[in-house]
């Protein structure tokens, strides 16, 4: 099935409970780089957070902790750690409990980063499904972010997710729909 990228400046809103098909969601979601001041509605935010809660984690440890930041004071603190909020009125800081993660056989990897990534991915796709624009932000020092926000010492920050509605005229970057051929990224053994 061919996936058609919709030529829009922002994601279609979820009006009347009509949802996009999953392939449309993944094809049309893009990293928004400038937001209007319109706040994300509570019911849409709840749907986004619920998608993260339903994400699978190693051994179902559910070591994630998502911080919702909306106040001007806390957004200003985030702005001291990363320049990549792009004016989003809501951000999610996705962290995980480093004392409650699964250590894989061999002891070289733990599940916290992977599990938090799965959770964040569920939430970012749920945002697109709700018609909410987003940006995955990892341009910051995780330790400084945790310290700035006063997070518990056992929690490690994975990423920041900008949420909101694109400012007028803002859309995907020119390279958004450029993808390598499947043959370049997949090998059958």
Question: Where are each of the predicted segments found?
Answer:
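Acidic, surface-exposed loops and disordered segments
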Residues: 2-189
């Amino acid at each position: 099935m061919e996936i058609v990228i919709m030529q829009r400046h922002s994601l279609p809103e979820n009006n009347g409970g009509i949802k996009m098909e999953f392939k449309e969601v993944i094809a049309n979601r893009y990293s928004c780089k400038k937001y209007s001041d319109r706040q994300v509605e509570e019911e849409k935010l709840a749907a986004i957070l619920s998608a993260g809660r339903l994400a699978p984690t190693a051994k179902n440890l559910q070591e994630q902790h998502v911080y919702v930041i909306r106040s001007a004071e806390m957004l200003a603190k985030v702005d001291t750690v990363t320049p990549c909020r792009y004016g989003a009125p809501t951000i999610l800081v996705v962290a995980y409990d480093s004392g409650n993660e699964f250590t894989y056989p061999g002891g070289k990897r733990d599940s916290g980063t992977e599990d938090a990534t799965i959770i964040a991915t569920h939430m970012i796709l749920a945002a697109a499904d709700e018609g909410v624009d987003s940006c995955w932000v990892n341009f910051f020092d995780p330790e400084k972010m945790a310290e700035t926000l006063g997070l518990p010492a056992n929690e490690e920050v994975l990423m920041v997710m900008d949420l909101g509605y694109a400012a007028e005229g803002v859309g995907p970057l020119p390279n958004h729909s450029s993808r390598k051929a499947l043959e370049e990224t997949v090998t059958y053994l």
